Amino acid sequence: MSELAFAPEVVAASRDPLVRVIVGPNDDPQGAVSAVRVAATPARVWEIIRDVEAYPSRIHMIERCHVEGDRLTMRLAFRIALFTARFGYTARLAIDEGRSLEVRYESGEPRDLRLRFDVVPAPAGDATLLYVASGYDITTLGWLVKLFLKHHPEIRYGVYPGSSLALLDSIRRAAESPG
């Protein structure tokens, strides 16, 4: 998850976010990488990414977040019709200050969670390129997801890009907003 999925020049020139599905050895989706040009300085984008405990106020699927040293405890909440499905996990944070933040799964659900945020100055120096990579074991998201996957396995091709794009857009919006 550490190499950039798109050349910086391609991201900088694109008007819209870019996304790529990550497939496993059996051509099954396992995650996605997305990238976008952010109209904010790298320092501002990094400030938003680095403030992990503020994620619940910025990212709708995150209900609670606590960081102690390099250990992260997070609770996710997904509202589905009349009920809410909640999941929690612990992970380690790997930080390359000002450049990348990676969440490395330790325990809980969704299993095998991998998140990575990369901040790259735009080639023209007028913006920031934000890359978000995400992946997890989709089968650990409860009985409802298993039921949907049993009858519609093709939705895996949308769930992973949707997760990555939701994270990307939340960080972009926060970085571009005043304050």
Which residues does each PLM region occupy?
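A short, structured loop/turn motif at beta-sheet edges
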Residues: 39-43, 67-70, 92-99, 118-129
